[in-house]
């Protein structure tokens, strides 16, 4: 039986259901085609936009996987940007249920690994540690292509559920179960270039960060907007030395894959960023007894710690933000600090972000008190903090206490700090939709707490407020019993000279 993914591919949904190829007069409320279109576009968007690559999950390496939190980010962004349900505010929890439905209908599946001898329950998790893989049935590709050739989009809803054991009356029923109601108005949009989308994300991330963190200067953030991503360096042609280095890395990677030890797996992942000579030294000094994991861990921790003690700090950009986040932590505003950290890390380029993610994961595992004892006289958590603090933040304007607090906070929340906040998703979606519809994208940015008014109204408001304040000042002078008659007369005379109209309005012509 074919899966949804094969049937979607056979129908060529990437072209048929792209935003630029919507049918004339399309409305999401149309049944059953409306819901069919939404599901098809969600599947296509997920398959084309989520990052699929080789990842680790509970001690083992798995090919062609994506993480749960990124799937939620992609679908959430797609639903809100395309306004399938009008202006309804879609909570992240609802998107998690959409992902659960897609998993139930075999669009993708959870990576099956055993933890303590038990299979993980097939429940979708919005986590950077939960891995999923798209389902495929290679033997049926040609058959599906022939079988579905010429299938109309209106019949896709029937085909969608034939491959599933789960009973459902229609696609519309599932939307109703999710408490989401489609909009009745047609929605027409055009494709936006990746450059425009990236610029909007960058701009709104900075804008939201400024809303959460009090910064004395904006120079660092303004410079951040001007940063141009560096072009990746071309790979060198293999020679004898490079081949040897490659083999050393391959041997260490193979060793890591063979070990059912999360600590070693996390450490091996960090070796990818170490220079070749250090990797060669690790390989040459590897214990003759590989089962002596204590010696292996001691070697790996020492090498990784040595490299990051001399490396430029990963988070040394936007140093003013460090103080802002640390101040939030000092004041007990953990949730706001977490969102600010998520925004801060969103501004990292992809390479540094991935390197920091691996390092932070290794730090969190190594800091576990039940893991390998790093130093006999010290707690693992304190050792990790001491060794890697300068590799993360080395800010002269940040006190040692705040630096320690920030590093420990990152370690404790390493599963959440790389998620994209739902608030940012909504802000970006509103702006992208405005651009798509040709409206002023700055009219409703999502984080301005005032109402836009025209010039005449602004001028009138200024005059009224000024007049009210002058009348209040005049009343204060007139009713102040502490002023002597001479002093009061002097002040009133000065006021009359400067603002005669206000003076006459208050006292009249009889004064």
UniProtKB/Swiss-Prot annotation:
Any single Pfam family the record assigns to this protein: DEP
Coiled-coil regions listed in the entry: none
SMART domains: DEP
InterPro entries per the UniProt record, alphabetical: DEP_dom, WH-like_DNA-bd_sf, WH_DNA-bd_sf
Any one biological process term the GO annotation gives: intracellular signal transduction
DEP domain location: 46-136
Similarity comment: family membership: Belongs to the DEPDC7 family.
Protein name (record): DEP domain-containing protein 7
Organism encoding this protein: Rattus norvegicus
């Amino acid at each position: 039986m074919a899966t949804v993914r094969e049937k979607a591919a056979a129908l060529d949904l990437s072209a048929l259901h792209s935003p630029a190829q919507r049918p004339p007069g399309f409305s999401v409320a149309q049944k059953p085609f409306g819901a069919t279109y939404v599901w098809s576009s969600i599947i296509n968007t997920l398959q084309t936009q989520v990052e699929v690559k080789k990842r680790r999950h509970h001690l083992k390496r798995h090919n062609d996987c994506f993480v749960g939190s990124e799937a939620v980010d992609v679908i959430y962004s797609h639903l809100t940007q395309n306004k399938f349900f009008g202006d309804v505010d879609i909570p992240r929890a609802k998107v998690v249920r959409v992902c659960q439905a897609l998993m139930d209908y075999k669009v993708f599946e959870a990576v099956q690994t055993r933890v303590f001898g038990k299979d993980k329950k097939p429940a979708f998790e919005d986590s950077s540690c939960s891995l999923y893989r798209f389902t495929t049935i290679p033997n049926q590709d040609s058959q599906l292509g022939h079988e579905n050739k010429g299938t109309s989009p209106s019949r896709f809803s029937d085909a969608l559920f034939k491959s599933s054991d789960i009973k459902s009356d229609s696609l519309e029923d599932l939307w109703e179960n999710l408490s989401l109601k489609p909009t009745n108005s047609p929605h027409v949009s055009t494709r936006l270039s990746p450059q425009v989308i990236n610029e909007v994300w960058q701009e709104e991330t900075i804008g939201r960060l400024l809303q959460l963190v009090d910064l004395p200067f904006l120079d660092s953030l303004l410079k951040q907007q001007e940063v141009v991503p560096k072009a990746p360096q071309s790979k060198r042609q293999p020679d004898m030395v490079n081949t040897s280095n490659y083999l050393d890395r391959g041997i260490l990677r193979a060793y890591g894959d063979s070990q059912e030890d999360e600590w070693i797996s996390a450490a091996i992942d960090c070796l990818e960023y170490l220079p070749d000579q250090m990797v060669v030294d690790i390989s040459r000094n590897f214990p003759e007894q590989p089962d002596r994991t204590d010696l292996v861990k001691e070697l790996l921790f020492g090498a990784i710690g040595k490299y990051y003690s001399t490396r430029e700090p990963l988070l040394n950009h936007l140093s003013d933000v460090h103080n802002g986040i640390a101040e939030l932590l000092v004041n007990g505003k953990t949730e706001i600090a977490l969102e600010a950290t998520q925004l801060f890390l969103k501004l990292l380029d992809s390479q540094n972000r991935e390197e920091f993610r691996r390092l932070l994961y290794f730090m969190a595992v190594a800091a576990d008190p039940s893991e390998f004892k790093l130093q006999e006289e010290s707690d693992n958590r304190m050792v990790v903090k001491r060794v890697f603090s300068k590799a993360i933040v080395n800010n002269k304007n940040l006190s040692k206490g705040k630096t320690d607090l920030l590093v420990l906070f990152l370690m404790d929340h390493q599963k959440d700090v790389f998620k994209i906040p739902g608030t940012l998703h909504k802000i970006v979606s509103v702006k992208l939709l405005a651009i798509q519809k040709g409206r002023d994208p700055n009219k409703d940015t999502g984080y301005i707490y005032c109402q836009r008014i025209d010039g005449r109204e602004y001028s009138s408001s200024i005059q009224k407020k000024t007049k009210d304040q002058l009348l209040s000042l005049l009343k204060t002078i007139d009713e102040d019993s502490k002023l002597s008659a001479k002093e009061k007369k002097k002040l009133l005379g000065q006021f009359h000279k400067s603002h005669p109209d206000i003076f006459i309005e208050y006292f009249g012509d009889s004064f």
